[in-house]
Amino acid sequence: MTAIILAAGLGKRMKSEIPKVVHSILGLPMINWVLRAVKKAGIENIIVVTGYKAEIVEALLPEDVKTVRQVKQLGTGHAVMVAQDAVMDDEVIVLTGDAPLISPETLINLYKIRREKDYDVVVASTFQEDPTGYGRIVRENGKLRIIEEKDASEEIKRIKEINSGIYVFKSDFLKDALKKINNNNNQKEYYLTDTVALAEKATAHVIEDPTEVLGVNNRVQLAEIQKIAQKKINERLMLNGITIVDPDTTYISPDVEIGQDTVIEPMTFILGKTKIGNNCLIGPMTRIIDSSIDDSVSIIRSEVEQAIIKSGARVGPFSRLRPGTTLLENTKIGNFVEVKKSTIGRNSKAQHLTYLGDATIGEDVNIGAGTITCNYDGVRKHQTIIENNSFIGSNCSLVAPVKIGEGSVVGAGSVITDDVPPYSLALGRGRQVIKEGRYKNKEKGE
């Protein structure tokens, strides 16, 4: 089985400088939603037809996906013509890249139907109360036709069974049929739909859930489809033992995994391939991207991206964990703390107003409020190492590269530029001077 995904269109009604299929739903570009369904249906040979700003679309595709370019957008039939030389299988499934909600189960069912009765083509159809914008399925005298809306009469426009844009073809039939279609229509395009009328054995299979085949033509429809996807994902998670306090304000990508008894508070975004364990508290007002979070972690009003958080850690409120951050068990990262490309050891804490970049911090370390790792010299980044059981006082600057030895104490307000040996006290600040009574008789204006 080969899948051809049509993704060459401009998408004029999106009024956008980027291709339509690149626009995201719940953090995942539409083209990747379709790819995800195709792969889960067990289809390995995948061809994506690109066109308008092809390089942007192609940059989103995995290496195992083939691409062909439709330099001139001359219709869906022409797009498949461009791709047909890369078809190596007896069956071809054709999908559009702007109908992101198609399920793997529906795709599997479609190719099973084609095989059972050796159809030349099976078309996925559904019924819409408002079919505006879709081609109509016309059944006459045992034959099947698809009429594009732009070419439809008023009588045909009243038909509510619509073409989804998803087809399963016998490869030999498709190759022959593509040679016979023409562009004698209002749009002067080669319609893939015209191949259906050439089939001796064709059927339209009605998909029970019409939302699966909804297409995106403008940003209103993009928002509507995101709302449908959001509802499906959140309901699935809640039925599997996750509490989502307000599903309407919780946005979760389709590949996110969340464990039982985790609570997701309102205004939370969990995106990418994030994995969250059991008994966690996430949110409110939190965004997590492509991160791994173990059991019993709380993340409150914070941002987490490409981070690893081990069990029992506490993050927030108002923390930022940037890519490359690892928090080990029972760490505490508090308000207005930013961590980047650093590992924080077990039971260590940085609870206030701190920046930790390119740092390795051991176990049972206290980072005082206002501590900064000065990791950048204007050219290169340098590492800070703080060993186990150290105590960093408030308002310290650690100028990297620098190492604080095990069990050491850095006095508040210090600027540390040299390594500190284990079990030492380091002070790097000016001596306090008091001139008692200096201003006792100071007159106003002096």
UniProtKB/Swiss-Prot annotation:
Q: Where is this region: Pyrophosphorylase?
A: 1-219
Region N-acetyltransferase: list its residue ranges: 241-446
Mainly localized where? cytoplasm
Q: Which GO terms describe its cellular component?
A: cytoplasm; membrane
GO BP terms, alphabetized: cell morphogenesis; cell wall organization; lipid A biosynthetic process; peptidoglycan biosynthetic process; regulation of cell shape; UDP-N-acetylglucosamine biosynthetic process
Sites where the protein binds acetyl-CoA = 369, 375-376, 394, 412, 429
Say if the entry is tagged with keyword Magnesium. yes
Question: What are the UniProt keywords, alphabetically?
Answer: Acyltransferase, Cell shape, Cell wall biogenesis/degradation, Cytoplasm, Magnesium, Metal-binding, Multifunctional enzyme, Nucleotidyltransferase, Peptidoglycan synthesis, Repeat, Transferase
Single GO molecular function = UDP-N-acetylglucosamine diphosphorylase activity
Which pathway does the UniProt entry assign to this protein? Nucleotide-sugar biosynthesis; UDP-N-acetyl-alpha-D-glucosamine biosynthesis; N-acetyl-alpha-D-glucosamine 1-phosphate from alpha-D-glucosamine 6-phosphate (route II): step 2/2; Nucleotide-sugar biosynthesis; UDP-N-acetyl-alpha-D-glucosamine biosynthesis; UDP-N-acetyl-alpha-D-glucosamine from N-acetyl-alpha-D-glucosamine 1-phosphate: step 1/1; Bacterial outer membrane biogenesis; LPS lipid A biosynthesis
User: What are the subcellular locations of this protein?
Assistant: Cytoplasm
Catalytic residues as annotated in Swiss-Prot or TrEMBL:
352
Chain segments carrying region Linker: 220-240
Task: Name the EC number(s).
Answer: 2.7.7.23, 2.3.1.157
Q: Which residues bind UDP-N-acetyl-alpha-D-glucosamine?
A: 6-9, 20, 70, 75-76, 135, 148, 163, 217, 322, 340, 355, 366
Isomerase among keywords = no
Give the reaction(s) catalysed.
Answer: alpha-D-glucosamine 1-phosphate + acetyl-CoA = N-acetyl-alpha-D-glucosamine 1-phosphate + CoA + H(+); N-acetyl-alpha-D-glucosamine 1-phosphate + UTP + H(+) = UDP-N-acetyl-alpha-D-glucosamine + diphosphate
Q: What does this protein do?
A: Catalyzes the last two sequential reactions in the de novo biosynthetic pathway for UDP-N-acetylglucosamine (UDP-GlcNAc). The C-terminal domain catalyzes the transfer of acetyl group from acetyl coenzyme A to glucosamine-1-phosphate (GlcN-1-P) to produce N-acetylglucosamine-1-phosphate (GlcNAc-1-P), which is converted into UDP-GlcNAc by the transfer of uridine 5-monophosphate (from uridine 5-triphosphate), a reaction catalyzed by the N-terminal domain.
Q: Which family does it belong to?
A: In the N-terminal section; belongs to the N-acetylglucosamine-1-phosphate uridyltransferase family.
> Which PANTHER family does its entry note?
BIFUNCTIONAL PROTEIN GLMU (PTHR43584:SF3), NUCLEOTIDYL TRANSFERASE (PTHR43584)
This protein's assembly is summarised as:
Homotrimer.
Name of the molecule in the record: Bifunctional protein GlmU
Organism name: Kosmotoga olearia (strain ATCC BAA-1733 / DSM 21960 / TBF 19.5.1)
